[in-house]
Amino acid sequence: MFRTMLKSKIHRATVTQADLHYVGSVTVDADLMDAADLLEGEQVAIVDVTNGARLETYVITGERGSGVIGINGAAAHLIEPGDLVILISYGVMDELEARSVRPKVIFVDADNRIVERGQDPGHAPAGSGLAGTAASVTSAITEAAAETDDAAKLDALLQQPEH
């Protein structure tokens, strides 16, 4: 079975521009694309923290170091400059990869400069004013339990007599 898992996210970026007459997509600073492991043309979900809008589009590369997050095409009706957004990329993977994937979680400041890189989707940086500690603790406990369960299964397999 294949599962769709969080691959990366850019958390609470500020939309810097919107162009209704552009041919679709979201323009993302190349530095942010690299940090979040996004490729040009890759599908992303955009969640607008400011107004609750949610949509899917694809990424195009913006000028490196510019901090650009540009909403293009019809999405400009839903998301405006100044809105806070979360860009989310998912990956389709087999069971083994799904259980071991460590997403790239990128937090940015108001100018879309990277302030923290992580792998815990439930973590909120200190001083951000965001809730997340409980989710991080729950995630760590769940991960530890999964590792213990996996280790027990491996031990059981190793102890089976060969045929």
Swiss-Prot record:
CC annotations in GO: cytosol
Location(s) in or outside the cell = Cytoplasm
Q: Name one GO biological process term.
A: pantothenate biosynthetic process
Keywords of this protein's UniProt record, alphabetized? Autocatalytic cleavage, Cytoplasm, Decarboxylase, Lyase, Pantothenate biosynthesis, Pyruvate, Schiff base, Zymogen
The protein's required cofactor(s) are namely: pyruvate
Name positions with the PTM Pyruvic acid (Ser).
S25
Q: List the disulfide bonds.
A: none
Q: Which pathway does this polypeptide act in?
A: Cofactor biosynthesis; (R)-pantothenate biosynthesis; beta-alanine from L-aspartate: step 1/1
The superkingdom of the source organism is Bacteria
Q: How does it assemble?
A: Heterooctamer of four alpha and four beta subunits.
**Name of the protein:** Aspartate 1-decarboxylase
Native source organism of the sequence? Saccharopolyspora erythraea (strain ATCC 11635 / DSM 40517 / JCM 4748 / NBRC 13426 / NCIMB 8594 / NRRL 2338)
Write the gene name.
panD
